Swiss-Prot record:
The keyword Magnesium applies. This is Farnesyl pyrophosphate synthase. Pfam families: polyprenyl_synt. Gene3D superfamilies: Farnesyl Diphosphate Synthase. Mg(2+) 2 binds at residues 156, 160. It comes from Nezara viridula (Southern green stink bug). A motif (DDXXD motif) lies at residues 156-160. It catalyses: isopentenyl diphosphate + (2E)-geranyl diphosphate = (2Z,6E)-farnesyl diphosphate + diphosphate. Belongs to the FPP/GGPP synthase family. GO terms for cellular component: cytoplasm. PROSITE patterns: POLYPRENYL_SYNTHASE_1 (PS00723), POLYPRENYL_SYNTHASE_2 (PS00444). Its EC number is 2.5.1.68.
Length: 403
């Protein structure tokens, strides 16, 4: 059943009319967070027909990716670097640079995207295909996804002039890097396709993978570009429709769809309907994930998330900003308009205080609970051939995250 219909069944008619007065019940799920106010919060907290996560009917608690999986995945990284550097024996300084770029920008982080490829393949492939050779290939493809992540982060940090990433200075802020970070990022991106060719060119799914990765790069670039040109003070850009587009392209495709679709092709799953169903769920997870990111950028613990939030001072088109402007009183709106997008620490604090005064954190937590349950129910509607446990695991690891 489409998630929009599930949403309509879960929410009362008064709340539907309040949140979507012009849609006549035909709501796009990604707009669930649009126009939530005190009435919706009150409904969420007291209506017995909304099932919170603790009352989920899911019988099987999703598994998690194990420490052994992480250890085995990391053990492949030196071989990845070796593959990328041994092709340049006559240019030793370039090989050294590529190794340094990879170590700094790819090997860190939680590696959730890469591990998702491996976990998804284990869940999707038939038993006879789970050979050491294929598991290793899944790990290599996982590193290809991690390399795209590193590529996007280097470019994004440079464009945003961010300060820290994963607990240390952004790559471009290193004294010997600077604007060269742009070409360094391209080395990471080109290395991704080098690995795909080196390890998969004789496989049946090679062309599908190349097209999948190229599509992820193109869509993510669209999203990043629109994100950079949608900053305040152009208040016409602070709309939920624009935000949904940015989120879908900037985050959802490469964070959730790419890893699972990679594993599906590797497991021999080419059925277009199964890919469509998986994509639908995964893009919704990506939207959910980005809303969480927006919240953590403002209210997260910098020591835990490993970076200093900059969305307020950059005037980003974020879920928090849109909800705040929609719910603000005239005086609160005046504060937001005069302070949002400023690098002045006092004005940044005023924006945070105003977010709290408006009740944005409470709206976010209501959104998070409702969305978790709605996506859970969409997962339960997936066809055979798409193991529910796989998608529930991804959702479970996303819910309530602090980094």
């Amino acid at each position: 059943m489409p998630l929009a219909k599930l949403c309509a069944k879960k929410l009362s008619s008064p709340l539907m009319k309040l949140c979507y007065p012009n849609l006549n019940g035909k709501l796009p799920f990604s707009n669930l967070s649009n126009i939530l106010d005190n009435s919706s919060l009150k409904f969420h907290s007291c209506n017995p027909h909304i099932t919170c996560r603790g009352l989920s009917t899911v019988a099987l608690r999703p598994q998690t990716i194990t420490k052994d999986d992480k250890r085995d995945f990391m053990a492949v990284f030196p071989d990845i670097v070796r593959d990328l550097t041994q092709l340049n024996p006559g240019i030793s300084d370039l090989s050294t640079l590529i190794s340094k770029i990879m170590q700094y920008n790819v090997s860190g982080g939680k590696k959730v995207r890469g591990l998702t490829v491996v976990y998804s393949y284990r869940m999707l492939a038939p038993d006879h295909a789970l050979t050491p050779e294929n598991i290793r290939l899944a790990q290599i493809l996982g590193w290809c996804v991690e390399m795209l992540q590193g590529f996007f982060l280097v470019i994004d940090d440079l464009a945003d002039q961010s300060i820290t990433r994963r607990g240390r200075p952004c790559w471009y802020r290193n004294p010997d890097v600077g604007l060269r970070a742009g070409s360094d990022a391209l080395l990471i991106q080109s290395g991704t396709f080098q690995l795909l060719q080196q390890h998969c060119k004789d496989r049946e799914f090679y062309i599908d993978l190349v097209e999948l990765f190229l599509d992820a790069v193109r869509r993510t670039t669209y999203g990043q570009t629109l994100d950079h040109v949608s900053s305040f003070p152009n208040i016409t850009h602070l709309t939920m429709d624009r935000y949904n587009f940015i989120t879908k392209y900037k985050t959802s495709y490469y964070t959730f769809h790419l890893p699972v679709a990679t594993a599906m092709y590797m497991a021999g799953i080419y059925n277009t309907e199964l890919h469509r169903q998986a994509k639908s769920v995964l893009l919704e997870m990506g939207h959910y994930f980005q809303v969480q990111d927006d919240y953590l950028d403002v209210f997260g613990d910098e020591e835990v998330i490993g970076k200093i939030g900059t969305d307020i001072q950059e005037g980003k088109c974020t879920w928090l900003a849109i909800v705040a402007f929609q719910r603000a009183s005239p005086s609160q709106r005046e504060i937001l308009e005069s302070c949002y997008g400023s690098k002045d620490p006092e004005k940044i604090k005023k924006v945070k205080d105003t977010f709290i005064e408006i009740g944005v954190p409470a709206v976010f937590h209501a959104y998070e609970e409702e969305t978790y349950n709605l996506i859970t129910r969409q997962i339960q509607q997936l066809s055979q051939g798409l193991p529910h446990e796989l998608f529930l695991t991804l959702l479970h690891k996303t819910y309530g995250r602090k980094q």
